[in-house]
């Protein structure tokens, strides 16, 4: 394994050619303040202790690493272990980062938070920590996502957040990020931008990765305990890339195959997909340089996925870099493949995963049978499917997939 991999951003916030701080001058003081505060917090054992306390006592970590016996047997290949991020308080991996950033904001003396959300999971996690630490929160959410995720909108409001519908563009996650950044520019003195994925201007990709890498650290110690060795392959779904980078990061320098699974939507050959790596090219969006779905003229294209959490047109800078150097292999799953995997997995394991996570499972179903029974795959179940019940119900009804 190549030990020359760059695992931290350079002084200018780049991983290879990706990353940076493409923001208006008015935001630079806030970015500089955040970078300094984060560096201090990271080095402060007291901050780390407080974070660990809340992760354990409030979130319920460590999450289990569960051997999927029935699923493994049905696929007839590698042993499959599930990293159960669906068992966190609020039902997904998003809380790991929301909690860390809220503690950081509190340390910086910020009384208010602003966040964007797609599926609503990051919004719910942000509203949860805002309630916990008595902070105000404004959440920007695309109007299209609000329609898809009514239950999460109500959750956020019940928790005390103000949810603002974004009608611009496609009314999805990308548009919500634009609005959240604009809001932050004009409320920068008392507000922290609680960015939910491993993207945005430096230091956000690093901050989000560090708070999410608790996933990979736990996997490492748990699999060593259970199997006495590291896994052969690790699989995670990828939108902006926070659950995947958190899963992969502690294994970057190990001899472990890493697979990120993008959303192919209605198919690679259509224009309705979210394949930033698969069909995209490097460009700048939301303050960072990364792989983007864009046309020849550099216009960012609309992303599509049945999963509200994966329909983002970019993929974070660290993932973009790992793709270029060949450290992470990017695969994809279409809406249909993901939904079929979700239904199959649920029947075998009695666990209903989020549609996002089902994209990773779809690739596991292709990968596992090609491996031997001694091989080990770990797949991150990034969230639970409660929020997706209506989408799953509609999908099955439209296709006459009776629940027999």
Swiss-Prot record:
On this chain, the residues bearing N6-(pyridoxal phosphate)lysine are 94
Which of UniProt's keywords are assigned here?
Amino-acid biosynthesis, Aromatic amino acid biosynthesis, Lyase, Pyridoxal phosphate, Tryptophan biosynthesis
Q: Which InterPro entries match?
A: Trp_synth_b_CS (IPR006653), Trp_synth_beta (IPR006654), Trp_synth_beta/beta-like (IPR023026), TrpB-like_PALP (IPR001926), TrpB-like_PALP_sf (IPR036052)
Q: In which pathway does it act?
A: Amino-acid biosynthesis; L-tryptophan biosynthesis; L-tryptophan from chorismate: step 5/5
As recorded in UniProt, its EC number(s) are 4.2.1.20
Q: Which reaction does it catalyse?
A: (1S,2R)-1-C-(indol-3-yl)glycerol 3-phosphate + L-serine = D-glyceraldehyde 3-phosphate + L-tryptophan + H2O
Q: Which GO terms describe its molecular function?
A: tryptophan synthase activity
Q: Which PROSITE patterns match?
A: TRP_SYNTHASE_BETA (PS00168)
Class of the enzyme per the UniProt entry, highest EC level? lyase
Q: Does the keyword Ion transport apply?
A: no
- What cofactor requirement does the entry state? pyridoxal 5'-phosphate
Q: What GO CC annotations are associated with the protein?
A: cytoplasm
What family does the entry list?
Belongs to the TrpB family.
The protein's job, in short, is: The beta subunit is responsible for the synthesis of L-tryptophan from indole and L-serine.
SUBUNIT field: Tetramer of two alpha and two beta chains.
Name of the protein in question: Tryptophan synthase beta chain
């Amino acid at each position: 394994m190549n030990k020359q991999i760059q695992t931290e951003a350079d002084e200018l916030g780049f991983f290879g050619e990706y990353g940076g701080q493409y923001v208006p001058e008015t935001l630079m003081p806030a970015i500089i303040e955040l970078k300094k505060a984060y560096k201090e917090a990271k080095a402060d054992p007291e901050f780390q202790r407080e974070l660990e306390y809340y992760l354990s006592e409030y979130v319920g970590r460590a999450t289990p690493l569960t051997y999927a016996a029935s699923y493994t047997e049905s696929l007839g290949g590698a042993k499959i272990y599930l990293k159960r991020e669906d068992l966190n308080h609020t039902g997904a991996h998003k809380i790991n980062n929301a909690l860390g950033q809220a503690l950081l904001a509190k340390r910086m003396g910020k009384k208010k938070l602003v966040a964007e959300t797609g599926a609503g999971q990051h919004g719910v996690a942000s509203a949860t920590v805002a309630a916990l630490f008595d902070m105000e929160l404004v959440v920007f959410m695309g109007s299209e996502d609000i329609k898809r995720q009514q239950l999460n909108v109500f959750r956020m409001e019940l928790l005390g957040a103000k949810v603002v519908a974004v009608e611009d563009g496609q009314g999805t996650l990308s548009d919500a990020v634009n609005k959240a950044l604009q809001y932050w520019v004009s409320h920068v003195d008392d507000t922290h931008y609680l960015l939910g994925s491993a993207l945005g201007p430096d230091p956000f990709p690093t901050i989000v990765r560090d708070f999410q890498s608790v996933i990979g650290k736990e996997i490492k110690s748990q699999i060593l305990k259970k199997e006495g060795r590291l896994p052969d392959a690790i699989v995670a779904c990828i939108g902006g890339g926070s659950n995947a980078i958190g899963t992969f990061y502690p294994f970057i320098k190990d001899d472990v195959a890493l697979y990120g699974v993008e959303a192919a939507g209605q198919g690679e050959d259509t224009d309705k997909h979210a394949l930033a790596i698969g069909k995209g090219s490097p460009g700048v969006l939301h303050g960072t340089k990364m792989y983007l779905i864009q046309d020849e003229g550099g216009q960012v294209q609309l992303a599509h996925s049945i999963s509200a959490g994966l329909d983002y047109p970019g993929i974070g800078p660290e993932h973009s870099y790992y793709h270029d150097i060949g450290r992470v292999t990017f695969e994809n799953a279409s809406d249909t493949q993901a939904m079929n995997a979700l239904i199959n997995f649920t029947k075998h394991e009695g666990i209903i995963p989020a549609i996002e996570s089902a994209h990773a499972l779809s690739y596991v179903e292709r990968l596992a049978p090609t491996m031997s029974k001694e091989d080990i795959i770990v797949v991150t179940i990034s969230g639970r499917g409660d929020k997706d019940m209506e989408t799953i119900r509609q999908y099955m009804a439209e296709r006459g997939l009776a629940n027999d």
